[in-house]
Design a protein with these regions (language model features):
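C-terminal catalytic subdomain
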Residues: 50-106, 114
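Amphipathic alpha-helical interaction segments
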Residues: 7-11, 15, 35-38, 57-60, ...
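Alpha-helix N-cap/helix-start motif at coil-to-helix transitions, marked by capping-box chemistry
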Residues: 3-14, 72, 88, 107, ...
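General structural signal for alpha-helix termini and helix-helix connectors
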Residues: 22-26, 42-45, 49, 64, ...
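C-terminal charged capping/lid subdomain of soluble metabolic enzymes
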Residues: 95, 100-170
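A general alpha-helix detector
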Residues: 15, 19, 39-42, 57-61, ...
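Carboxylate- and glycine-rich phosphate/diphosphate-binding segment that chelates Mg2+/Mn2+
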Residues: 1-50, 152-158
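Hydrophobic residues within well-ordered, non-membrane alpha-helices that form the packing/core
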Residues: 20, 47, 82, 117, ...
Length: 170
């Protein structure tokens, strides 16, 4: 845990929640695009020391096997992992993060992430892939990327299986 990284992450998240939909709706809005560039840079600095975690680890098989763009694949599981991390050991940090960037709690922040994905036409599930049990098992296995071990809450294979089944509509 790095306090300076927390401050950077909070600033980046505030910018994203304020400007991402605006930049999406109006691509010629220079201020919104500039603020999203700033958010991207600051977010990158924020995870330089603590490294990326579960959403990033799960993005690799989704991108490599199913060709879901990397950023969209990271975002696909973000609201799911916000909820898991808020309920686990150290969850008070996630709750505090959510409050500091303007949400009532982590649940409301996760709901806002999901709503943004819907409004922007981003993937919110994997139902269209019609994944079978073997494909879900493969996603679980490949998600065991080293970044998964950076997550503040231990993510088990059972948790990954449950998440992928939920996303697949099973």
């Amino acid at each position: 845990h790095q306090p300076i990284c927390d401050v950077l992450a909070m600033h980046a998240a505030e910018l994203v929640f304020k400007y991402v939909y605006r930049a999406y709706r109006k691509p010629d809005d220079e201020e919104a695009r500039e603020k999203m560039c700033e958010a991207s840079l600051i977010a990158g600095l924020a995870f330089t020391l603590p490294k990326t975690t579960s959403s990033h680890a799960c993005s690799f098989p989704l991108t490599n096997i199913y060709h879901i763009p990397h950023g969209e694949a990271c975002g696909l599981t973000l609201d799911y992992f916000i909820r898991i991390n808020a309920k686990g050991e150290g969850g008070e940090c996630v709750e505090e993060f959510a409050r500091r960037i303007g949400f009532k709690d982590a649940e409301e922040m996760a709901d806002a992430v999901l709503e943004l994905k819907k409004k922007m036409g981003l993937r919110c599930d994997l139902k269209d892939l019609e994944l079978d049990d073997d494909q879900i098992a493969e996603l679980v296995r490949i998600s065991r990327h080293p970044n998964l071990y950076n997550n503040p809450v231990e993510i088990t294979d059972e948790m990954l299986d449950e998440m992928y089944r939920y996303l697949a509509g099973k």
